[in-house]
């Protein structure tokens, strides 16, 4: 196990003995920021370098958030279904073709004329329940009562306009796989030979737009402290010879991390981001449900799931306030 300490955090553990240097530096960067102050930071043993953060990162939410910690694949999850019976090997090629036909992959989404909208009303009901639970937790944590949120088609229309995504893309991306490391897999148990269907996907382009919208806001919500401006004035006013000013300003900027500083969301900006996170994470869950519905239709009426495990691994849990980067 590796233990790390930083400027703001003295309690970080990585549950493995050897980690790549770049991953260590990414973790140290977070420990040197106020966002990690006073909480336990725990890094899973399969950790490796991600985009701006390590995979396997877990930390309680503090009074600020960084949308880039979770990134664009909000709500990325794995669902595994244990099938009630095995699938004959002779069916594999036909089934593979059927799934590729019924589940858009890569950059592709469904066409509006083929949209199966069975999921929309249950989605609204679920996301509203999740938001209600989140608002209760927000009040318990911060003592702030927020106005009621009712997600419906009109709300989604405003949200899509805000983050810059077409409404048709929002609705037609449900039931689509995406690319990267997302997959649909048929597995076999080495114990009893049972077959398992596994789906790995997230919130698609909607999640990307949510992340990018809030990440851009970070640059507007935090300003340099007054001490920086006072020192800046002193340097430009009192430094002699004046040829030394550029070097002194460079040292000042380095000390305050100007140009490299991690800007965080706080207060209302943090609240708005977490609301959108709840919406996107629930969206990812229904994306899985829609794909499963299509695949079981391809399998035929004789196939059902006798057990199901759904696990989200890239999310912010807004009920127990945990950040999980997977």
Predicted regions and their residues:
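Mobile "lid/hinge" segments at catalytic clefts and subdomain interfaces of large enzymes
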Residues: 76-82, 207, 227
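Active/ligand-binding-proximal structured segments within catalytic/core domains
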Residues: 70
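Domain-length cofactor-binding catalytic modules of enzymes
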Residues: 2-29, 36-43, 49-59, 63-67, ...
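Metal-associated gating/positioning segment near the N- to mid-region
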Residues: 78-94
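Short coil/turn segments at secondary-structure boundaries
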Residues: 110-115
């Amino acid at each position: 196990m590796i233990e790390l300490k930083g400027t703001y955090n003295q309690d970080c553990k990585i549950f493995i003995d050897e980690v790549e240097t770049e991953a260590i530096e990414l973790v140290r960067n977070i420990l040197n920021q106020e966002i990690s102050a006073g909480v336990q930071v725990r890094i899973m043993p399969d950790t490796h370098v991600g985009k701006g953060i390590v995979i396997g990162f877990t930390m309680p939410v503090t009074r600020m958030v960084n949308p880039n910690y979770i990134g664009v694949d909000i709500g990325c999850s794995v669902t595994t279904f244990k099938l009630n019976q095995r699938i004959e090997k002779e069916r594999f090629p036909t089934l593979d073709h059927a799934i590729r036909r019924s589940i858009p992959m890569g950059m592709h989404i469904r066409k509006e004329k083929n949209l199966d909208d069975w999921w929309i009303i249950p989605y609204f009901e679920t996301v509203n329940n999740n938001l209600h639970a989140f608002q209760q937790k927000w009040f318990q944590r911060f003592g702030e009562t927020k106005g009621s949120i009712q997600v419906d088609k009109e709300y989604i229309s405003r949200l899509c306009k805000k983050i810059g995504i077409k409404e048709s893309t929002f609705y037609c991306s449900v039931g689509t796989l995406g690319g990267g490391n997302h997959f649909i897999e048929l597995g076999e148990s080495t114990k009893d030979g049972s077959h398992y269907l596994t789906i790995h996907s997230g919130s698609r382009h909607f999640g990307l737009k949510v992340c990018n919208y809030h990440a851009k806001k970070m640059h507007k919500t935090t300003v340099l402290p007054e001490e920086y401006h006072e020192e800046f004035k002193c340097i430009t006013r009192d430094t002699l010879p004046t040829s030394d000013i550029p070097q002194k300003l460079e040292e000042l900027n380095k000390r305050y991390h100007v140009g490299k500083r991690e800007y965080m969301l706080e207060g209302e900006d943090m609240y708005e981001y977490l609301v959108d996170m709840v919406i996107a994470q629930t969206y990812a869950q229904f994306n899985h449900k829609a794909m499963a519905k299509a695949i079981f239709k391809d399998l035929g009426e004789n196939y059902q799931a006798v057990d199901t495990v759904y696990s989200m691994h890239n999310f912010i849990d807004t009920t127990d306030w945990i950040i999980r980067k997977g």
